[in-house]
Design a protein with these regions (language model features):
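Active-site groove signature of glycoside hydrolases
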Residues: 72-98, 120-129
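The substrate-binding groove and active-site-proximal loops of carbohydrate-active enzymes
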Residues: 19-30, 53-66, 87-101, 128-131, ...
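Aromatic- and glycine-enriched glycan-recognition loops and surfaces
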Residues: 4, 17-43
């Protein structure tokens, strides 16, 4: 699995033999040969292949583990690797000790890196790898700055896990680590919004800070081909930040990737760039050229039931172009692997365009008092919505953010709001009860935990789930999370996995039939999995609370409520 493409001609690979608990083990012969071949191809293409090890979760700060790590590096060296990194990110416990980290890294630097003239400077990713997670009072970053050998490069994601790099932000970290930061820019990585594609322009990073960085890393999506648009752009930024032109580079990248259908791919990418609501609160512009028309039409139609023919015509043309571009791109599937990767999103994009045109047809039919045409178009819209639902439930069914979302920032809200408005108008005028709902989330997540409160909920038939988070969650003392259901349901069970075995010592699980009165629920535990049988008890809300005053560290791997619908 590629975890990061280090522009400036570097590549970093992460796999099951780089991290706990297998980091001490050698690669099996087959995997070692594959890795050796990959390193060889990288070198032939003038790419520094960086191999990273992630030992922090179970490392023992003793001579034995130190020598095991050094031995692993030697094995990788004999496979051709000449660039190395040690990651201490997303861990908890004793492995986060900055003094011990520095001692280990300095030992590697002095007994491995510096004795081999063809090995590049060592890279490390700290436990506190962004400003929002740092605790200056504990001095973690300043300890690294003081104790790490000056040649060791320290990675940094910015003010938050997902953030653009600013002048103030880079100065803040450099002052503490006493060296230029090695920026790990978490874009276009989508492992927290896996139902979205991030294919828009690369922008937001300060163009005057090149001298304050020792490196710049782009973390790609799991879609290697679709990530090339952003990688191309970040490479251009890293080559010469001061002369970087976001829009031109984006267009050039698309032309380079798919010259025979660049117009269509550019159109699709322009409407598939935002991340949607997410726990990191990082958003991107989307449908930029359509935004003024969409805002004008939506405000006028929802408030006054009026619109200009110019706005209407632009929307019609946009929806038609969505259909056409999808078909043209699908026809290129045998010519470029990027189309195979994004195929489900192309299906969804086309259906959304068809839905948009039919919703506009409903508007015209209503204006003309043509009930027959209105009902025909209404039924077609509902059928298209069902098809989009099936695609969302069928493709890309990962355990984190399953499904297929497209054009979600401007186009889909416009279509949904217009459909709801015209259907409600029709119901009022003709005393009908047509369903005006589009897809929506009926349930609510409420929390005073900053890393949890913005996470999206998922609904799959009778299961309500909090989208899992990959990083360590710091759960404050007496903090809680609550899932509030839209109505009372018979409860079947609750499953919780916080990645730690001692949850029962500090956590309390409760249910409520009215959202006001709470009763504690007992649960069974097998390793890290907590299970509570609700035995058809009525539930309107579920709450989990840290009953202690001190902060707890968890991994939010599973929180699922199963109801009887």
């Amino acid at each position: 699995e590629i975890c990061a493409c280090l522009v400036g001609s570097e590549m970093c690979i992460r796999d099951s033999y780089h991290s706990s608990p297998n980091w001490r083990l050698p690669y099996p012969e087959k995997e070692a040969k594959q890795l050796q071949e990959l390193v060889k191809v990288a070198q032939e293409n003038e790419i520094d292949f960086v191999w990273a090890i992630h030992p922090g979760q179970d490392i023992k700060w003793n001579k034995e583990d130190c020598e095991l790590l050094l031995a692993k590096f030697e094995k990788m060296y004999h496979l051709g690797v000449r660039s190395f990194a040690v990651f201490f990110d997303d861990i908890s416990g004793e492995g986060t000790n900055p003094v011990k980290q520095a001692e280990l890294l300095n030992y590697i630097d002095e007994h491995f890196v510096k004795v081999k003239p063809d090995v590049t400077p060592l890279i490390m990713c700290p436990t506190e790898y962004n400003k929002s997670w740092s605790d200056p009072a504990k001095g973690y970053l300043t300890t690294l700055g003081d104790k790490l050998n000056p040649s060791i490069q320290i990675m940094w994601t910015g003010d938050r896990v997902i953030s653009d790099i600013t002048q103030d932000g880079i100065q803040w970290i450099n002052d503490r680590i006493k060296r230029p930061a090695y920026i790990w820019w978490n874009f276009p990585v989508s492992d927290y919004v896996r139902d979205h594609l991030l294919m828009g322009p690369v922008y937001g990073n300060d163009t005057q800070i090149a001298h304050q960085m020792s490196g710049f890393v782009t973390n790609p999506m799991e879609h290697a081909e679709a990530s090339k648009i952003a990688i191309y752009s970040v490479a251009s930024y890293a080559w010469n930040p001061q002369k970087y032109n976001s829009e031109k580079t984006w267009k050039d990248a698309i032309m380079n990737i798919l010259p025979d259908a660049a117009t269509e791919l550019e159109f699709f990418a322009a409407h598939n760039s935002d991340l949607g609501p997410n726990g990191h609160k990082y958003r991107r512009e989307e449908s930029v050229n359509l935004q003024p028309t969409a805002q004008s039409f939506t405000e006028s139609y929802i408030k006054n039931k009026t619109y200009t023919e110019k706005d209407f015509s632009i929307l019609q043309e946009t929806f038609s172009q969505m259909i056409e571009s999808s078909d043209i791109l699908v026809a290129h599937a045998d010519k470029n692997p990027i189309i195979v990767e994004i195929m489900p999103w192309l299906y969804q994009f086309k259906l959304l365009g068809e839905t948009g045109n039919e919703v506009l047809a409903m508007v015209k039919a209503y204006d003309k008092n043509d009930q027959s045409l209105f009902m025909r178009k209404y039924k077609h819209v509902k059928a298209l919505q069902q098809q989009m639902f099936q695609i969302d439930q069928t493709y890309n069914q990962n355990p984190y953010q399953p499904g297929i979302k497209t054009a979600g920032r401007v186009i889909k809200p416009l279509i949904d709001q217009t459909f709801a408005t015209v259907t409600q108008c029709y119901n009022q005028k003709y005393s009908t009860l047509l369903n005006a709902e589009t897809d929506y989330m009926p349930h609510k997540l409420i929390s005073d935990i900053s890393q949890i409160k913005n996470l999206p909920l998922q609904v799959k038939i009778n299961r309500i789930q909090i989208s899992p988070a990959l990083e360590v969650i710091k759960w404050p003392g007496n903090g809680s999370l609550t899932i509030e259901l839209d109505q009372v349901y018979p409860g079947e069970n609750i499953e919780i996995d916080f990645g730690k075995p001692e949850i029962a010592t500090w956590g309390s699980l409760e249910i409520s039939a009215n959202g006001k009165d709470w009763s504690k629920v007992n649960f069974t535990q097998e390793k890290n999995l907590l299970t509570a049988s609700l035995q058809q008890k009525p539930i309107k809300a579920v709450r989990f609370t840290n009953m202690q005053h001190q902060e707890q560290e968890i991994y939010l791997r599973r929180f699922i409520i199963t109801i009887d619908k």
